[in-house]
Curated annotation (Swiss-Prot):
Compartments where located: Cell inner membrane
Keyword tags: Aspartyl protease, Cell inner membrane, Cell membrane, Hydrolase, Membrane, Protease, Transmembrane, Transmembrane helix
Organism annotation: Azoarcus sp. (strain BH72)
UniProt function note: This protein specifically catalyzes the removal of signal peptides from prolipoproteins.
Molecular function GO terms recorded: aspartic-type endopeptidase activity
Protein name: Lipoprotein signal peptidase
Reactions that this protein is recorded to catalyse: Release of signal peptides from bacterial membrane prolipoproteins. Hydrolyzes -Xaa-Yaa-Zaa-|-(S,diacylglyceryl)Cys-, in which Xaa is hydrophobic (preferably Leu), and Yaa (Ala or Ser) and Zaa (Gly or Ala) have small, neutral side chains
Length: 176
């Protein structure tokens, strides 16, 4: 067993809450998508409020349907990219496992990314169904996974901004 400093937990124990959060995000994302797939037809719109609708669409590209019009290679490209990014974020989560904000951010991104990877593998595209609009202007439809990824990136940025405020400022360099 590796030597642990006083008050330090084993890596798996320290990462467990964040891994559970990632799994919960992925599970909730997939549950909501299964409900939508079971109850809606492709392209069907269910108005909820004057600015929010449920609409079932399939996104073969990335954010904002980037590369969606291509022949299908992007399915495997975005799947591979998500797997690589999740691996990198797991390594960062391990590195920052005793913190709170960064591992939570990484967990949200990982859970969302895996949720969308599952879609690409099962459906060949990501299932989107949340649509916000104002009059004729609308935001592209998205899903819970996309929301978790966005929230995770926002938390990462916030953590970095907070960390920058706590660093002592370096004085001017003096020539030797």
């Amino acid at each position: 067993m590796p030597d642990l400093q006083a008050g330090q937990r084993p890596a798996f124990v320290a990462m467990l809450p964040w891994l559970v959060l990632a799994a919960a995000v992925m599970g909730l994302d997939q549950l909501t998508k299964q409900v939508v797939l079971a109850t809606m037809q492709y392209g069907e719109v269910i108005p909820v409020t004057g600015f929010f609708d449920l609409v079932l669409v399939f996104n073969r590209g990335a954010a904002f349907s980037f590369l969606a019009e291509h022949s299908g290679w992007q399915r495997w490209f975005f799947t591979g990219l998500a797997v690589v990014i999740c691996g990198w974020l797991l390594a960062l989560m391990h590195q920052h496992r005793e913190e709170r904000l960064l591992p939570a951010a990484f967990a949200l991104i990982i859970g969302g990314a895996i949720g969308n990877v599952v879609d690409r593998l099962l459906h060949g595209a990501v299932v989107d169904f949340l649509y916000f609009h104002a009059g004729r202007y609308g935001w592209p439809a998205f899903n819970l996974a996309d929301s978790a990824i966005t929230l995770g990136v926002g938390l990462m940025l916030w953590a970095q901004l907070r960390a920058g405020k706590h660093k002592p400022e370096a004085g001017p360099e003096r020539p030797s």
